[in-house]
């Protein structure tokens, strides 16, 4: 291998894929004068539901909002427990706390980073009301096993699909005729992005109606159109709700991204293939495994170092990549080690040893549809140069 040459410019960890179509779509909305929740939001709800194969879609301003609404529709609250994973972003656990319930963590499968169904079963008590599995990095959680557990114990299933646009379980998109609810993120870094945004999908009419009302102050259905010719100024507040709705500027971006999904995914997978080939036979690195039931959407490229084979730590490895002008991230710092949860529940790192070990060795490499093969090759070479420099 020739000597590694550091590029002069910084390579961002993630960048949104913005074409002229997105610019034009938002310009059209801005010129229309209808910027808030309106016809474009309604169109997106219809098209996204059709895309994933669900009966209902409620477009909201974040996946956090969707996760919160999912629990609210079930009346989950104080005294209840909800099982989830410690290897996730804070919103998964925070929304459980926001309804007054207690998040109960179950450890992961270290090969995938996904919540382990066997660990879920160990955590079930008489207070357990729901399970919130996370489709981590674009891998599908084992919905067959988790669904059976939920059926056996009469538990609500709220899927956190923040990473899972284009993820498939047994050939079907996540969200296809869901057992309970599925919550998505359209944050700027996601496979489908609109800056900030999210969606809740369900096949349940009652859940959909309640979530729709709660997402916009508790206003009665149709209130979004109260300024239109066919609308009515009269509305009711059915129950105190939240300001969670998506608006048309976001929806226009989301619709355009949805129409470009196939091409964006194709280019994302070209970069993944570079990484997979480069790291396949490197004993200092551990690649994420994909279960047979799953089609990985590749929201993240998850790489783990093998600490005992290197003379530097994961944190030092990241600094070495930064010195080579490669931006990376970590997904995630295990929640049970965060002060908000450790202090409240008395957690220690070793309470969830697999999640902790995963968290302490993981590095997320740059991955986005505009990355390109050449840039992916540079990232791979940078990683291999660090390994070569610091292997034992």
Which residue stretches match the model-derived regions?
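N-terminal "arm"/small-domain region of PLP-dependent enzymes with the aminotransferase-like
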Residues: 1-34, 39, 236-238, 366
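Phosphate-binding glycine-rich loop
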Residues: 34-81, 95-99, 105-107, 172
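PLP-dependent aminotransferase class I/II
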Residues: 42-46, 54-57, 118, 130-134, ...
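Structural detector of well-ordered beta-strand residues that form the stable sheet scaffold
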Residues: 58, 83, 104, 156-158, ...
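PLP-dependent aminotransferase-like
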Residues: 72-164, 168
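A short alpha/beta connector and helix-capping loop motif
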Residues: 114-123, 171-181, 383-385
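Conserved active-site segment immediately N-terminal to the catalytic lysine
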Residues: 159-194, 233-238
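Active-site PLP attachment segment
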Residues: 177-221, 248
